[in-house]
Swiss-Prot record:
Keyword Phosphoprotein annotated: no
Gene Ontology BP, a term: bacteriocin immunity
Protein name: Probable leucocin-A immunity protein
Keyword Heme part of the UniProt annotation: no
Pfam families referenced in this protein's UniProt entry, alphabetically: EntA_Immun (PF08951)
Source species: Leuconostoc gelidum
Length: 113
């Protein structure tokens, strides 16, 4: 149980840190979508059963969106994304089969706008 709490705490720290690093550029192509998803994920972290899978989907979404919009991250931003990737790797292939990583709606429930 303690291990899961550490992962949850780390995930919260890194998602918030990345959000704060990127929020100033939210009006640039792709950054707004990434910031929206980071905010959504940070809200869902406490209620999700599988933190690793959620973070894994987040990192995949960030990578696809960055590639599509030709976003170059700074060293600090990239370091945080790598730390999130380490957390996400613990999920293995859980939830990746036939997934659309570029779909932002995977982070929203049907009752949210």
């Amino acid at each position: 149980m303690r291990k899961n709490n550490i992962l949850l705490d780390d995930a919260k720290i890194y998602t918030n840190k990345l959000y704060l690093l990127l929020i100033d550029r939210k009006d640039d192509a792709g950054y707004g979508d990434i910031c929206d998803v980071l905010f959504q994920v940070s809200k869902k972290l406490d209620s999700t059963k599988n933190v690793e899978a959620l973070i894994n989907r987040l990192v995949n979404y960030i990578r696809i969106t960055a590639s599509t919009n030709r976003i170059k991250f700074s060293k600090d931003e990239e370091a945080v994304i790598i730390e999130l990737g380490v957390i996400g790797q613990k999920a293995g292939l859980n939830g990746q089969y036939m997934a659309d990583f570029s779909d932002k709606s995977q982070f929203y429930s049907i009752f949210e706008r």
